[in-house]
C-alpha cells in the first residue's frame, strides 16, 4: 500500500513539473494573411538540439542507437528507421492537421507543404526537443520548442512575422511508449496553440 501511495505521489510530482507551452519574442504583424488562400509550409531541423544537455541530433541518434543495440541486438537499428521516418510520418502531418483544424476551418487559409505558388511561406524551425518517457506508473511529456516565421516565398530574407514557441507538451490520454509519437503530439500542440493565436490576431 505504501509503495502504491509513493508511486502516486511521484507521478503527481512529475506531472506538475511539466512546463506549459509559452510564446515569446513575437514580432511583426499577421495582417498580410487576411486575403490569402494558401500558405506554403517548410520544416527545418538544421538547428535542432535534443535533451536537457542540448546535444546535436547526430549525438543523440548515435548514443541511443548504440544503447538499444547493446540491450537487444538490432533494436537500435530498427529504432533508427523509425526515427528517420518520424518527421514525415508523424511530426509534420500532425502540425499541418491542427493548422487545418484551427486556421483553415476558421479563416479558409490552407497550410500546405510544397506549395511554391503561395506568396508566403511558414517556416517551422525545430530548435529543441525533449522526447519524454513513459514507464507505465510514471511518465513525462515530450517538449518541442520551435521558431515560427512567415516569410515571402520568393524572398525568404524578408521576415514578416516571427514568434518562438517554448516547450509545447507532447502527450496523449493513456500510455504512449513511442518517443517519436510523443514528439509528434508536441508538434500538434504547437500548431493548435499557434493556429488559435493566428485566428485571434486576424480578428483585430
Predicted regions and their residues:
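Short, solvent-exposed, polar/charged sequence segments at loop or secondary-structure edges
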Residues: 85-127
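Surface-exposed short loop/turn segments
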Residues: 23, 109-158, 169-173, 177
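Bacterial Sec-dependent N-terminal signal peptides
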Residues: 1-25
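Solvent-exposed, acidic/flexible segments
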Residues: 84-92, 141, 176, 180-187
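C-terminal/domain-edge helix-coil "capping" segments
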Residues: 21-33, 49, 158-204
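A structural motif
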Residues: 64-71, 155-164
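A structural "domain/chain start" motif
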Residues: 20-93, 196-204
